């Protein structure tokens, strides 16, 4: 054991010699899948050079001896951060789409011919391995919906290795959906076409929106199938196995540090490496020296101060990330500690969603029955997850120090970044005023009261006529009213979800046996259902004309306050024309015209399930330029989808159609 640890220490010391983003790859033997005599030679991908530093710096479990398939058998993986695995081949892999901007990170140009698509399908499905790739699954734990779940790990993803580019950058490649690993538990390690298309498109959409995120380089489907019960309603169906190539500096997450956790007082579960403080030190050394080298350099002689500076920076990055989410209306859906990147990146796209009608209590994940991960709760949950990270870092970071850093940094950094971004979204370019926070809050309240579309309302505000007596004001108000929810949309949104008899029984139980009612954990759900019933009753008594008049009144009040604030901004500018140009430019650069709404993704998925990948590729191109551009007319003409049997066209920048309200995404999505 002493020799083993000494070897690991030497490996880590060698890894530290390579600063962040700098690579010095050495020739690697050709990787081969188990049972394969010789791997096909890549051509387009031949220039990729691997230098798998993580596997040298961190403990790796050697697969146990046994029959074929034993390395992927479900089991605890103690004393290791990775375990060796192999992808399971797919039948007839086919390329769905490539992201050229993501692959450019690896030094790859556009595929030269159709042959390159076949090559991408072969290597990015895991059916063949690139020279130097060393597949491994990462061990981590996590708090899921607030409860410690014990060992989780890469149950459907595999580390391929780290590609070093000619510019000295280093990128970790992952295959998501490449087959079972020891962390797959009772699952099959596969992902399906619908969930893979969603992750592929959203990873790239978020990058082009300017949100910190992991990337997706390719999506490959196949003729292999697995059974999935999408809505957990007893109606399973066969779906195509699909793999996404994911790209990031690292996929290490908060849960990576939870493998050392002792038995949880509530769940009784523990991490697989309890008591292995030596591995926690290794993991901290690796993460900080590799991805926070400036912190390593500044505190090389004081590990506690180094670890404190590291936690402070992770806290700030996480606060900025979730602030960006709130500003583009993004809901993650599964904010468990195992889905939180140690670099402050958005990671693991599952039942995510973008706000359509603004609702601060929107829950995008149908599996989230308590609304724990609602849109408005995301900052609070991220702070909670950081608290769990602080717990996981002790004793290397004393808990009281971690808690003090969290209290000092998170809320302040979130509010600062959020308000800074919101000022840009409102085109406030000249002066910052204390009252700006109240203006933003009132805007969101107005959007909520009128059911306004989040993305389109912000985008429309760039055309708000600043002049008091502008003839365009009436036209602007008319366009703004179009972005408010109609009576039909509101009645659909607030329709009761529970049988009235069941609701009545639950209310009777709450009265007669409050202790039992509390144990059932349905209080939040019942409260939401009562709100829906009350709202539905109010809507039944409201006419369309009354709704329109009410909405106009709400918006007139806020727009008056907004114009007054714009006047103050203009007062600080020397040149009114220059201010107006900058005001509009900043708004166009911060208010997207296109986001990946669920119905846009669903259209692409349904076409792909019929074998037509053109819609996935078209949506991908659309999402690469989400913000306003002068050449937008041609793009807009293409950004439409057939709406119904009559072939009417709906722009992808329009409010979603009514049928989109019926879409449901779960943890299976």
From Swiss-Prot:
Impact upon substituting residue 667 to S: No effect on redox complex formation
Location in or out of the cell: Mitochondrion
Biological process annotations from GO: protein adenylylation
Catalytic activity, reaction form: L-tyrosyl-[protein] + ATP = O-(5'-adenylyl)-L-tyrosyl-[protein] + diphosphate; L-threonyl-[protein] + ATP = 3-O-(5'-adenylyl)-L-threonyl-[protein] + diphosphate; L-seryl-[protein] + ATP = 3-O-(5'-adenylyl)-L-seryl-[protein] + diphosphate
Keyword presence, Kinase: no
Pfam families: SelO
Protein name stated in the entry: Protein adenylyltransferase SelO, mitochondrial
Protein species of origin: Homo sapiens
Annotated gene: SELENOO
């Amino acid at each position: 054991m002493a020799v083993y640890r000494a070897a690991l220490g030497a490996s880590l010391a060698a890894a530290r010699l390579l600063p962040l983003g700098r690579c010095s790859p050495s020739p690697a033997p050709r990787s081969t899948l188990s049972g394969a005599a010789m791997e096909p030679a890549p051509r387009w991908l031949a220039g990729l050079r691997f230098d798998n530093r993580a596997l040298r710096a961190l403990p790796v479990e050697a697969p146990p001896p046994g029959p074929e398939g034993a390395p992927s058998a479900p089991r605890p993986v103690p004393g290791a951060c990775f375990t060796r695995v192999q992808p399971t081949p797919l039948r007839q892999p086919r390329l769905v789409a490539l992201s050229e901007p993501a692959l450019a990170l690896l030094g790859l140009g556009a595929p030269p011919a159709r042959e390159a698509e076949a090559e991408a399908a072969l290597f990015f499905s895991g059916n063949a391995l690139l020279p130097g790739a060393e597949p491994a699954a990462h061990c981590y734990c996590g708090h899921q919906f607030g409860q410690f779940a014990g060992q989780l790990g890469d149950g459907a993803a595999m580390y391929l290795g780290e590609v070093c580019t000619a510019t000295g950058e280093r990128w970790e490649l992952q295959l998501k959906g490449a087959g079972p690993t020891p962390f797959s538990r009772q699952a099959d390690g596969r992902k399906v076409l619908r969930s893979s298309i969603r992750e592929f498109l959203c990873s790239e959409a978020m990058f082009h929106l300017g949100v910190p995120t992991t990337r997706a380089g390719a999506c490959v489907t196949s003729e292999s199938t697995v059974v999935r019960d999408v809505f957990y309603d007893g109606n399973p169906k066969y779906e195509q196995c699909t793999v996404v190539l994911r790209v990031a500096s690292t996929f290490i997450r908060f849960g990576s540090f939870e493998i050392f956790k002792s038995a949880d007082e509530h769940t009784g579960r523990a991490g697989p490496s309890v008591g292995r403080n030596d591995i926690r030190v290794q993991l901290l050394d690796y993460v900080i020296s590799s991805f926070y080298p400036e912190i390593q350099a500044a505190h090389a002689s004081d590990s506690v101060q180094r670890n404190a500076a590291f936690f402070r920076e992770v806290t700030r990055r996480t606060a900025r990330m979730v602030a960006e989410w709130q500003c583009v209306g993004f809901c993650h859906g599964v904010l468990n500690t195992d889905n939180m990147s140690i670099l402050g990146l958005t990671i693991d796209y599952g039942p995510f969603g973008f706000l359509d009608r603004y609702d601060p209590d929107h829950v995008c994940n149908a599996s989230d029955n308590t609304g724990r991960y609602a849109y408005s709760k995301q900052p609070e949950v991220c702070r909670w997850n950081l608290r769990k990270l602080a717990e996981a870092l002790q004793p290397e970071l004393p808990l009281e120090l971690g808690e003090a850093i969290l209290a000092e940094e998170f809320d302040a950094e979130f509010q600062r970044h959020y308000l800074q971004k919101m000022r840009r979204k409102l085109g406030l370019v000249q002066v910052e005023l204390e009252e700006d926070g109240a203006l933003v809050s009132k805007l969101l309240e107005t959007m909520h009261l009128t059911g306004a579309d989040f993305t389109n309302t912000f985008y429309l505000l760039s055309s708000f006529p600043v002049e008091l007596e502008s003839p365009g004001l009436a036209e602007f108000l008319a366009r703004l009213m179009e972005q408010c929810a109609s009576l039909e949309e509101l009645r659909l949104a607030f329709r009761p979800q529970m049988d009235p008899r069941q609701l009545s029984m639950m209310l009777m139980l709450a009265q007669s046996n409050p202790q039992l009612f509390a144990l059932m954990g349905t209080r939040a759900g019942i409260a939401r259902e009562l709100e829906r019933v009350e709202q539905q009753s109010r809507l039944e008594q409201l006419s369309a004309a009354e709704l329109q008049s009410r909405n106009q009144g709400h918006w007139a009040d806020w727009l008056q306050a907004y114009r007054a604030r714009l006047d103050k901004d203009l007062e600080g500018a020397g040149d009114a024309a220059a201010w107006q140009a900058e005001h509009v430019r900043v708004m166009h650069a911060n208010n997207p015209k296109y986001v990946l709404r669920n119905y846009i993704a669903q259209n692409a998925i349904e076409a792909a399930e019929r074998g037509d990948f053109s819609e996935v590729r078209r949506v991908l191109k659309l999402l690469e330029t989400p913000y306003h551009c002068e050449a937008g007319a041609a793009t807009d003409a293409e950004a439409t989808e057939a709406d119904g049997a009559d072939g009417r066209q709906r722009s992808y920048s329009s409010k979603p159609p009514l049928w989109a309200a019926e879409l449901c995404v779960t943890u299976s999505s």
